[in-house]
Amino acid sequence: MGSSDQATAHARAQAASARLFDDACAVIPGGVNSPVRAFTAVGGTPPFITAARGCRLTDADGNHYVDLVCSWGPMILGHAHPAVVEAVAKAAASGLSFGAPTPAESELAAEMIARVAPVERIRLVNSGTEATMSAVRLARGFTGRAKIVKFSGCYHGHVDALLADAGSGVATLGLPSSPGVTGATAADTIVLPYNDIDAVRQAFTEFGDQIAAVITEASPGNMGVVPPAPGFNAALRALTADHGALLIVDEVMTGFRVSRSGWYGIDPVDADLFTFGKVMSGGLPAAAFGGRAEVMERLAPLGPVYQAGTLSGNPVAMAAGLATLRHADAAAYAALDANADRLARLLSDALTNAGVPHQIPRAGNMLSVFFTDTPVTDFASARATQTWRYPPFFHALLDAGVYPPCSAFETWFVSTALDDDAFDRIAAALPAAARAAAGADEGNS
């Protein structure tokens, strides 16, 4: 089959998704409700997913894919896990939302507190953005200070104060920040290079009595996977404590994914506040922030820092989260680690055989593919990689029935549901994908 025939066949295979995308673009800005889903970084039409089970996705055209995105992290047990589906159905049968306290809220909060030792109180919210926004407000209210330190390439949701030089979709689209963020808001945000503890010391030297908090991803995964240098998070803890500022560790991505206790189980730094999302709600919309009782009890109704949400603690989302966490046992985390090891080996072998420079950094069972010979340690080195190799690599995998992240700056996620057949498909797809990356032309990026 010639290249034109392949293009025609692929167009036919995506015809239903293409129609759905056109329909979506008529009513939704860009046709998507989160920018990275539009395939801007890789080109082409995004498949419209109609079903998922285990480690496999099905799109509107009937194509099947091995899922290496896992809804951007939360689906650690795979899609439609029977215990999670049963818990959701049972909760939904009793009512979808009450706007009142429910037992499941306290049960999920207690489960999370039992896993992360420094967390003494939890407040449930609806999204990771809401969690980080609320944690920042609480830090300012607790300290009486205004400035927040964040790191270039770390993404903490689309909070105005935290969008400056952020990762995730902001990096994918090549945006330095976002219009609509006022100068006054930006002025209270200090953006520093990631993994540069000397820069943090200098910021405290200049602004120490004005800094309310330092916020960092526990192990960043929104500029690709860029783990903290050994001791970096602990040094942040020491500096914030010395200057009366709070440390906020964002575990929205890593929380309860990379271990039973999230990144805290790997690098146990006692932050003042943590934010959580994704895994804790089993794929439904819920998130949380929590920390020391002394700090958390400044929240209304106990204290003056206001935070509220009509759907916070939604009983159906709580049921999904509880079922997910209760089935995420030691065997599940061992399987996640083994599957990440297996995927990383397959990726590295294929890229090595094709002569493609690459790094595959890991944060527990999270990983990334960077096209470079040089280790990536911060946002600058992530952006300096050969990202133009990624679109042909991505599309070769997608065409072969493997669904990887649609940006070089996003994380690859595994689930416990990956089986030998799935890995066989990945292994069969990778040589051609690696050759496509090897033959990529920077001028066509």
Swiss-Prot record:
One of its GO terms (biological process) is protoporphyrinogen IX biosynthetic process. InterPro entries: 4pyrrol_synth_GluAld_NH2Trfase, Aminotrans_3, Aminotrans_3_PPA_site, PyrdxlP-dep_Trfase, PyrdxlP-dep_Trfase_major, PyrdxlP-dep_Trfase_small. NCBIfam families: hemL, PRK00062.1. One of its GO terms (molecular function) is transaminase activity. It is found in: Cytoplasm. Keywords: Cytoplasm, Isomerase, Porphyrin biosynthesis, Pyridoxal phosphate. This is Glutamate-1-semialdehyde 2,1-aminomutase. It is an enzyme of class 5 (isomerase). Belongs to the class-III pyridoxal-phosphate-dependent aminotransferase family. HemL subfamily. Gene3D superfamilies: Aspartate Aminotransferase, domain 1, Type I PLP-dependent aspartate aminotransferase-like (Major domain). It catalyses: (S)-4-amino-5-oxopentanoate = 5-aminolevulinate. Homodimer.
